[in-house]
A protein has these predicted regions:
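Surface-exposed binding patches on compact interaction domains or structured appendages
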Residues: 1-4
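Aromatic-lined carbohydrate-binding surfaces of glycoside hydrolases
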Residues: 7, 18-25, 32, 36-195
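Surface-exposed loops/turns
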Residues: 10-14
Length: 195
């Protein structure tokens, strides 16, 4: 089966409309073509502007599915093309809340013991969403997750921990670990100041 979406302009007159669609592809290495006729009944109804906030999860690390199963590098032209297709399509179907995967790139402090944050990549994504999507709300990325995705599993967080050599490593730590608390104490004030 196939779902065919046909946008109906708000000023379209009610009545029956006829059309056709041609679908082509490959089956067992051979080109196939199918033509189908269809009829659409348009009713004299105009829906009010959507008031519901709608979010759907999307996964940029799965953009390969939109790119002939080829890996899509983050922040590449192919990445932004996949993102554009995704947000424009989802917006057309009513999505207006967007999950922000970028949280700010950690930057070790000069002494190597703490972190500051570079929010330029996050800003780039926000600006992109504002240009290409219906945005009523931007949802921050989930900070803590369940360790095995079960409702009763303990929370953990994947946080950057300074390595003492001017860089950092990500570590998956229990939510109540002092290093997670140190990250929270550095991150949220920096984010608030940036916003």
């Amino acid at each position: 089966s196939l779902w065919l979406d046909i946008p109906i302009p708000a000023d379209a007159e009610a009545g029956l409309y006829e059309g056709s669609v041609r679908i082509s592809g490959l089956k067992n290495g051979k080109r196939i073509v199918a033509d189908r006729q269809f009829t659409i009944q348009v009713y004299p109804v105009t829906l009010p502007k959507q008031s519901l906030l709608v979010t759907n999860w999307y996964f940029p690390d799965k953009f390969s599915f939109m790119n002939d199963n080829e890996y899509v590098e983050d922040d590449s032209p192919a990445y932004w093309e996949c993102m554009r297709q995704l947000v424009e399509t989802a917006s057309a179907y009513g999505q207006n809340v967007w999950l922000l995967y970028e949280t700010g790139t950690p930057v070790p402090t000069a002494d190597g013991k703490g972190l500051t944050f570079d929010f330029s990549r996050m800003d780039k994504t926000i600006e992109f969403l504002l240009r290409h999507a219906d945005v009523r709300l931007i949802e921050a990325n989930h900070f803590a997750k369940r360790s095995h995705n079960g409702w009763t599993d303990p929370f953990w967080a994947n946080v950057p921990v300074p390595d003492g050599e001017g860089s950092y490593v990500y570590q998956r730590l229990p939510y109540d670990d002092p290093r997670v608390q140190q990250y929270i104490a550095a991150y949220f004030p920096a984010l608030q100041e940036h916003l």
